[in-house]
């Protein structure tokens, strides 16, 4: 834990929306009178019918129900586009920066309106109605924003699938939410390489039969197959429709989107967010956490395939009339200066990225950063996983020239928006700490039995109060919603994260405590990777755990037992890595595979993951009690053949 403290720069305290006194006052008000507080915040969006009911929430076992602003009526796309046309039609809404540094464009709010209406009319003409699901499998191109906002405009529910997922993962997600339409591109571009998106969609649709239409955006012009009865080119369909499309009236509790996240059971969960509460919360957190002022150029480097892209590239910034940058590329293409060149090119003021990217660029040294100016920057942010103090210090010193505060934000797909975070004009910073709760958020640290722990302590992080951005259910499976988040500690939302609170009341996230690994800020269920490995004909059994990784935060460590007669080899190791890439996607590739004669199991057959974690972390002396194992000799073999020895890496 870092002992350093960075005070709020005086000029920040002066110009920010919130200084420390204001934070204390607003936070106290949000806890004392949540209905009054959130009724006031609800005014930041335009309502067709303003809500009179603010919060209606139950965390009671068997009756988990979350409703905010439930009698209000609005439209998210109207709030992100139309309401800005009177005052900023010609202001840039989206700066798009392509994979190729020579490829960029500015899209104004008026242009955004016209393009979204065209996409919405294409969908309406294909009989997409309010409540229908649309799967979006696109690269980071403007059409991804058009597609999401077009769905919001007509009341369809979008399900964005990250374009790095495999055909099998895509098929699973299309089937689970019963999508009528898939919107994709011929190919994606990433780091100079082509990604076969349409071919992946074709492969996925061989496994499902619920899709009527595939809308294809021409990105590269590469050769693809088109099914004449199902597939249509976006650019051709767009020529046949108008740039006007009336907005659907949406109840605040009507669904806005589904976003799949890894679960510990291996079956992805469709996290469902609704319209009113989500939009209010995304807008509010974007304004206060990033201290967004009119005219600022704001860049969140996430992909819209993840929740950070939903809340902090699209909905939050656009609801606030912001200039938001959308980046198709990767941090190290064409070289390690790419992020910093983009900041200089577009005069970016606020920069929000992941610790994984920071750590990877840090390995390339200071040179690629210091040869750029970055003088436009005034605020840095971190998201996706805890940031280690060394990376925090480098980010602050080298990228921010010791002058830009860092907002180290903690939240989840399920929370819709940021929950624990510094506010740049209000919060003294400690490297590695997410610091204090946002307005209305009440964290509680509990022990394994659910007892509340007070003061400076460490345990499991729960939240005792609801907030408007909270997910409402797991799509199609409310019982799973209750089981996953509310059954461990009754009457509380359990985050699945461990947490430490220091003597100053600052929160330090210590990582997942369930069977989910956080790889480069993206959650990956261990069961999902295990299922992929066991599907290989040569694999009898597999167990997957996380271990500390210098770049990714956590790496994937797989223990694999082979079928009788099969022999471990380097070739088979590579084959299994490729197999998992194909089954799930590159993000799930194991970093280490250890072939094992068996796995440590209790006499009842339960795998002792605690032991596997310690071996993967190269801590064989900390295995604890192994007497309950059916065959303790298995552990000796695993320790002897472990892949992640410190001396091996030296």
UniProtKB/Swiss-Prot annotation:
UniProt keywords, alphabetically: Acetylation, ATP-binding, Ligase, Magnesium, Metal-binding, Nucleotide-binding
InterPro entries cross-referenced by the UniProt entry: Ac_CoA_lig, ACAS_N, AMP-bd_C, AMP-bd_C_sf, AMP-binding_CS, AMP-dep_synth/lig_dom, ANL_N_sf
GO cellular component: cytosol
Binding site for ATP: 384-386, 408-413, 497, 512, 523
Pfam family, one: AMP-binding
Residues modified as N6-acetyllysine: 606
Chain residues that bind Mg(2+): 534, 536, 539
Catalytic function, reaction form: acetate + ATP + CoA = acetyl-CoA + AMP + diphosphate
GO molecular function terms attached to this record: acetate-CoA ligase activity; AMP binding; ATP binding; metal ion binding
Disulfide bonds: none
Cofactors that this protein relies on: Mg(2+)
Organism domain of life: Bacteria
Keyword Cytoplasm: no
An individual GO BP term: acetyl-CoA biosynthetic process from acetate
EC number: 6.2.1.1
UniProt PTM comment: Acetylated. Deacetylation by the SIR2-homolog deacetylase activates the enzyme.
Positions contributing to CoA binding: 190-193, 308, 332, 520, 581
Similarity remark: Belongs to the ATP-dependent AMP-binding enzyme family.
Cited HAMAP family: Ac_CoA_synth
Entry function: Catalyzes the conversion of acetate into acetyl-CoA (AcCoA), an essential intermediate at the junction of anabolic and catabolic pathways. AcsA undergoes a two-step reaction. In the first half reaction, AcsA combines acetate with ATP to form acetyl-adenylate (AcAMP) intermediate. In the second half reaction, it can then transfer the acetyl group from AcAMP to the sulfhydryl group of CoA, forming the product AcCoA.
Protein name, per record: Acetyl-coenzyme A synthetase
Gene this chain is encoded by: acsA
């Amino acid at each position: 834990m870092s002992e350093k403290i960075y005070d709020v720069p005086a000029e920040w305290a002066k110009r920010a929306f919130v200084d420390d006194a204001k934070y204390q006052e607003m936070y106290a008000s949000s806890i004392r009178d949540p209905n009054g507080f959130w009724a006031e915040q609800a005014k930041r969006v335009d309502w067709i019918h303003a809500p009179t009911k603010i919060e209606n929430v139950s965390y009671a076992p068997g009756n988990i129900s979350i409703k905010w602003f439930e009698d209000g009526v609005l439209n998210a796309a109207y709030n992100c586009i139309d309401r800005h046309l009177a005052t900023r039609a010609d202001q840039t809404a989206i700066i798009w920066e392509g994979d190729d540094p020579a490829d960029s464009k500015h899209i104004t709010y008026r242009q955004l309106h016209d393009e979204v209406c065209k996409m919405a009319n294409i969908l309406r003409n294909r009989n997409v109605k309010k409540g229908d699901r649309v799967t979006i499998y696109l690269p980071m191109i403007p059409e991804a924003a058009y597609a999401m906002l077009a769905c919001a405009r007509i009341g369809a529910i979008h399900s964005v699938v990250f374009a790095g997922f495999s055909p099998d993962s895509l098929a699973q997600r299309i089937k689970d939410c019963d999508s009528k339409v898939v919107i994709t591109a011929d190919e994606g571009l990433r780091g100079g390489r082509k990604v076969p998106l349409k071919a992946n969609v074709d492969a996925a649709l061989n496994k499902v039969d619920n899709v009527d239409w595939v809308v294809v955006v021409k990105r590269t012009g590469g050769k693809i197959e088109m099914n004449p009865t199902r597939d249509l080119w976006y650019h051709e369909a767009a020529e046949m429709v108008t740039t006007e499309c009336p907005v659907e009236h949406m109840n605040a509790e009507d669904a806005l989107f589904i976003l799949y996240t890894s679960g510990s059971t291996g079956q992805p969960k469709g996290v469902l967010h609704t319209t009113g509460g989500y939009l209010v919360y995304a807008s509010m957190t974007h304004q206060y956490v990033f201290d967004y002022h009119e005219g600022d150029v704001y860049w969140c480097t996430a992909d819209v395939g993840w929740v950070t892209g939903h809340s902090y590239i699209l909905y939050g910034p656009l609801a606030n009339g912001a200039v938001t940058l959308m980046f198709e590329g990767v941090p190290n293409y064409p070289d390690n200066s790419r992020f910093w060149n983009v900041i200089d090119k577009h005069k970016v003021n606020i920069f929000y990225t992941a610790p994984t990217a920071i750590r990877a660029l840090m390995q390339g040294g200071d040179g690629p950063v210091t040869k750029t100016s970055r003088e436009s920057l005034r605020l840095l942010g971190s998201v996706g996983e805890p940031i280690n103090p060394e990376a925090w210090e480098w980010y602050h010193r080298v990228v921010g020239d010791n002058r830009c505060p860092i907002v180290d934000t903690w939240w989840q797909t399920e929370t819709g928006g940021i929950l624990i975070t510094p506010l740049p004009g209000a919060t003294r910073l400690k490297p590695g700490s997410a610091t204090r709760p946002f307005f209305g958020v009440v964290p509680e640290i509990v022990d394994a039995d659910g007892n509340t722990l007070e003061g400076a302590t460490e345990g499991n992080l729960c939240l005792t109060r609801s907030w408007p951005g909270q997910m409402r259910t797991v799509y199609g499976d409310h019982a799973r919603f209750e089981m996953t988040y509310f059954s461990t500690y009754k009457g509380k939302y359990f985050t699945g994260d461990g947490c430490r609170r220091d003597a100053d009341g600052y929160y330090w996230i210590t990582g997942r405590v369930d069977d989910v690994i956080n790889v480069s800020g993206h959650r990956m269920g261990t069961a999902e990777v295990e299922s992929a490995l066991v599907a290989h004909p040569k694999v009898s059994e597999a167990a997957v755990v996380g271990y500390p990784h210098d770049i990714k935060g956590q790496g994937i460590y797989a223990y694999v037992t082979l079928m009788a007669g099969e022999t471990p080899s380097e070739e088979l190791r590579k084959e299994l890595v490729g197999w998992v890439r194909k089954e799930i996607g590159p993000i799930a590739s194991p970093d280490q595979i250890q072939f094992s004669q068996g796995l440590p199991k209790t006499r009842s057959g339960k795998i002792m993951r605690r032991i596997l974690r310690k071996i993967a972390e190269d801590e064989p002396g900390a295995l604890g009690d192994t007497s309950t194992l059916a065959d303790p000799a298995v552990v000796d073999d695993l320790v002897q053949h472990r892949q992640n020895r410190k001396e091996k890496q030296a």
